[in-house]
């Protein structure tokens, strides 16, 4: 159970965060709205239609951010869910060791008694900056879910459909480990070229490797470091 003071602190943090984040959210929406499909005869018609549909589908999610729906949702749920908690000191240190200053771990909440979904399906999910699960959550799963928090901070609520589409894609969570990373690096690809669930597993596997003290893990982690630069260099507020 959380104290009332924790609830009040949570609401205060969310309001301050939303106000500070608003200019960035407006900028995201405007950039998205002025995007125009570049008509070029080298593009096939079905590709233009698909890209245009994705553009239209994304508009509501950018609007959701501007009208503070993520914060309204989290504050409302916080009033009804007394199992949510802030990260422990140990969890805060783990988060900072992986993400640096690219997330705000002191704002993250965990509900490890989330009945709707996690209890039946034994899975975790992220609603903006709240991690929902049922029972104990391992460190590796915590890191994976924190990637979705990071995605929300960097890209907005659009992370939700992108993560769902990633789960249903042919690749799913599979990024083909070191070989897949090397191939992407050779093509000058970055972390955002992977789908939103692959990103979570890449960071999670990097975290796992850092816990193992053997030569093979050290060698393999070098290519992961290249993509981890994207995690630690991206903004919280601009």
Predicted region positions:
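N-terminal low-structure segments adjacent to metalloprotease catalytic domains
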Residues: 1-61, 66-67
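Metalloprotease/metallohydrolase-associated module, dominated by Zn2+-dependent proteases
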Residues: 2, 10-17, 21, 25, ...
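Short loop/turn hinge sites at secondary-structure boundaries
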Residues: 32, 36, 44, 54-59, ...
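Active-site surface patch of divalent metal-dependent phosphodiester/phosphate bond hydrolases
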Residues: 69, 104, 139
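Protein maturation boundaries and topogenic segments
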Residues: 72-74
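Short pre-active-site segment immediately N-terminal to the catalytic Zn-binding motif
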Residues: 83-86, 101, 118-145, 153-156, ...
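Mature, structured domains enriched in cysteine- and short glycine motifs
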Residues: 106-120
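Catalytic Zn2+-binding segment of zinc metalloproteases
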Residues: 146-166
